[in-house]
Curated annotation (Swiss-Prot):
It comes from the Eukaryota. Negative results: the recombinant protein does not inhibit calpain-1 (CAPN1), a C2 family cysteine protease and legumain (LGMN), a C13 family cysteine protease. Does not provoke cell death (PC3 prostate cancer cells). This is Cystatin. Residues 29-129 form the Cystatin domain. It comes from Tropidechis carinatus (Australian rough-scaled snake). Gene3D superfamilies: 3.10.450.10. One of its GO terms (molecular function) is cysteine-type endopeptidase inhibitor activity. The keyword Nuclease does not apply. It is found in: Secreted. Disulfide bonds join 91-107, 120-140. Belongs to the cystatin family. Expressed by the venom gland at an extremely low level (at protein level). Inhibits various C1 cysteine proteases including cathepsin L, papain and cathepsin B. This protein has no toxic activity and its function in the venom is unknown. It may play a role as a housekeeping or regulatory protein.
Amino acid sequence: MVHSQLPVAAPLRLLCALLLLPSATMIPGGLYPRSVTDPDVQEAAECAVQEYNALSANAYYYKQLRIVEAQSQVVTGAKYYLTMELMKTKCAKTTGKPKVYKEIQNCELPPKAQQEKLTCHFQVWSRPWLQKIELTKMSCN
């Protein structure tokens, strides 16, 4: 009786072991971790900071301190899910042409006692063939 179970048990154990291995294949529409230094992630972060400052009612610009986490999802294009830390700068938003990302990143920070840091969650949708990248969702605290 024991011998009759062996042919079934061995393949079943092998199948279970294979299912426990990390999968190298991508699941369509799934979220995947991305390196925070990846150029596509950096481009999405620039868009997020630029749009945050354009939409924010704050009188001062906020600059990127760091990207805490980055994930992407294949959609019609790519959607990036970013967790970022932003810091309020000394650069005031004045009338005229708004500052671009690189200018904002060069803004000085206030003294430690006056610093305001935000943790933000951004979703950025990139469609390179249309030369379009846009912020679709944000929340900061």
